[in-house]
A protein has these predicted regions:
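Hydrophobic ligand-binding cavity/cleft-lining segments
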Residues: 2-66, 119, 165, 179-184
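Hydrophobic-ligand binding "helix-grip"
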Residues: 49-53, 57-66, 73-124, 128-130, ...
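Short alpha-helical basic/polar micro-motif
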Residues: 36, 112, 153
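A conserved amphipathic terminal alpha-helix motif
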Residues: 131, 135-179, 183
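Generic recognition of short, well-ordered alpha-helical segments
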Residues: 43, 109, 138-139
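Short beta->alpha junction loops/turns
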Residues: 44, 101-103, 141
Length: 184
């Protein structure tokens, strides 16, 4: 099942379709926060259990400035699964790529891109995965759109809590570097 949501401070446009046995979601959303702040929030995997629905625990195995490997335990109703992923961090481009290492999936990848926008930050988020278990895959497919929407909303709510509700609109002058001629 594939879901695409395009949203800018309003009701999202949602498109869903089946793509083999993989579950896919893509979303672009404008959030009134700085791209650097949102990048830092998503890169801070260790804190996911504090605010992310169904994330019960997070353990960082290894980390440096540009990558980390982490174990996450996710749980929903009677399901509880642990998986490991590698997270590639690109702070210069404000991009995060997540690759699956081990756990209950056949395949898992997701990406985040944080782009400057006149209203704050445009987030480009993509995830696709397939579980090894057909039972787990069928359960997730019925709940998938709502689950991903809640997860993305949890990041936005966390950003509001950490960085303030919604900063004032960023003007074009604030977004551009200011250059002044030397006084002579």
């Amino acid at each position: 099942m594939q879901t695409t949501i395009l949203r800018r401070f309003g009701t999202p446009e949602i498109r869903r379709w089946q793509q083999a046995d993989m579950t896919v979601h893509s979303e672009r959303r404008v959030i009134p926060h700085r791209p650097e702040d949102l990048y830092a929030l998503v890169a801070d995997v260790r804190r996911y259990p504090e605010f992310l629905p169904w994330c019960l625990a997070a353990r960082i195995r290894q980390a440096d400035e540009h990558a980390l490997s982490a174990d996450l335990i996710i749980g929903f109703r009677m399901f509880r699964e642990r998986f490991t992923s590698y997270v590639e961090l690109n702070p210069d481009q404000l991009e995060i790529e997540v690759k699956y290492a081990e756990g209950p999936f056949k395949y898992l990848t997701n990406s985040w891109r944080f782009l400057p926008h006149e209203d704050g930050c445009e987030i480009d988020f993509h995830v696709d995965f397939e579980f090894n278990s057909r039972l787990l895959q069928s359960v997730i497919e019925t709940l998938f759109t709502d689950a991903v929407r809640r997860m993305v909303q949890a990041f936005e709510t966390r950003a509001n809590a950490l960085y303030g509700r919604a900063p004032e609109r960023i003007s074009a002058d604030q977004a551009r570097p200011q250059v002044t001629a030397p006084q002579g």
